[in-house]
């Protein structure tokens, strides 16, 4: 048994649960990936030597064909059925499925995205994918944002998913909808943030503001008094802190 700090031990357990690898191999891959569980898992599954059994690519295509649109090489119309079959029943995990499949469009998984992801995850049946997504659920549901690289990557992905075609920013309404899904259980003052935006901003949100808002949430969850207005924060977040101090004391 290896002696590890609590956070690394948790990641090691998660890695072993997903891959069924030994503890020694889990530690090796996690160290190589700077203890980022998702990256370590991807690297593990990218190495054919880790698998004694032949991977059934035809089985993946059979699964894809079950859910694909009529006349289209994508899953869209039957996406709700697909996520239900892998035991996904909430909006955050529906977005998490798109994240794991590295989709480029909201509500659509192309054939290439599906085939490449299922092979990368070494899933050639629905039950193994369901197991993978349950581990993702555990990662994303943690309220410890300071030690959750998986949630940060998921959060940043969601912004790109929300962009309209040929747009760099995301509309305020779309951002509010997405923030509600991904942060409603992680930031107690989320509704105050929305009230501020609707009263004083009303404009699209930039990627920089979206990303840095997560860093702000980490501070505000501890104490908003620890916010340093002299730091390299977007003006919008500076203005929100002033709004909060004036209206929420």
From Swiss-Prot:
Keyword Ribosomal protein: no
Every DCUN1 domain range: 55-245
Domain UBA-like: 4-49
Alphabetically ordered keywords of this record: Ubl conjugation pathway
Record InterPro entries: DCN-prot, DCN1-like_PONY, PONY_dom, UBA-like_sf
SUPFAM superfamilies referenced in this protein's UniProt entry, alphabetically: UBA-like
GO CC list: ubiquitin ligase complex
One Pfam entry name: Cullin_binding
Gene3D superfamilies from the UniProt entry: Cullin, PONY binding domain, DNA helicase RuvA subunit, C-terminal domain, EF-hand
Biological process per Gene Ontology, one example term: protein neddylation
Superkingdom of origin organism: Eukaryota
Primary role: May contribute to neddylation of cullin components of SCF-type E3 ubiquitin ligase complexes. Neddylation of cullins play an essential role in the regulation of SCF-type complexes activity.
Name of the protein in question: DCN1-like protein 1
Taxonomic classification: Eukaryota, Amoebozoa, Evosea, Eumycetozoa, Dictyostelia
